Amino acid sequence: MKIAVINGGTRSGGNTDVLAEKAVQGFDAEHIYLQKYPIQPIEDLRHAQGGFRPVQDDYDSIIERILQCHILIFATPIYWFGMSGTLKLFIDRWSQTLRDPRFPDFKQQMSVKQAYVIAVGGDNPKIKGLPLIQQFEHIFHFMGMSFKGYVLGEGNRPGDILRDHQALSAASRLLKRSDAI
């Protein structure tokens, strides 16, 4: 089973990275650090004559990579009680891909994937991060994806996540449950 960690963090080696690494320890996983790729915001042309136009950025290459994977882990810091703008920008572009003739089976291809979420925040994330988890539930439901689990960790400054033993333990078990892989 191929695994991709789609990381929306913007701090290299930050708390989100640490928790995501813990989750895939012992597995062969591809890490896609979205901040390293130029991705343009969506220009909503769903109802315009001619529809969406091709965009010259790295988005399509990332889509091609994740379509090859069976398990997708969406990792993000919790910024202002939601996912990072970097990750949101990537997911927003799915609206374009759903209508892109180069990806005619995008929704169907995504529907067979197992999805997980890892999120880290500094302001009571195990409560205040729940609306973010619900947002991902809706995203995955719309795409027909199987939402298998999540971990919410607490950390603000670099390295803080190492004190959240509950989150570290949950991350280490995330893919090891009997219904995963």
Swiss-Prot record:
This entry's Enzyme Commission designation comes to: 1.-.-.-
Establish whether keyword DNA repair is in the entry: no
**What is the protein's given name?**
Putative NAD(P)H-dependent FMN-containing oxidoreductase YwqN
Q: Which UniProt keywords apply?
A: Flavoprotein, FMN, NAD, NADP, Oxidoreductase
Per the record, a Pfam family? FMN_red
State the function annotated in the UniProt record.
Putative NADPH-dependent oxidoreductase.
Question: Its domain of life?
Answer: Bacteria
Where does this protein have coiled-coil stretches?
Answer: none
Family note: Belongs to the SsuE family.
Which InterPro entries does the entry link to? Flavoprotein-like_sf (IPR029039), FMN_Rdtase-like_dom (IPR005025), ISF_SsuE-like (IPR051796)
Q: Which cofactor does it need?
A: FMN
PANTHER family per record: NAD(P)H-DEPENDENT FMN-CONTAINING OXIDOREDUCTASE YWQN-RELATED (PTHR43278:SF4)
The kind of enzyme this is, by top-level EC class, is oxidoreductase
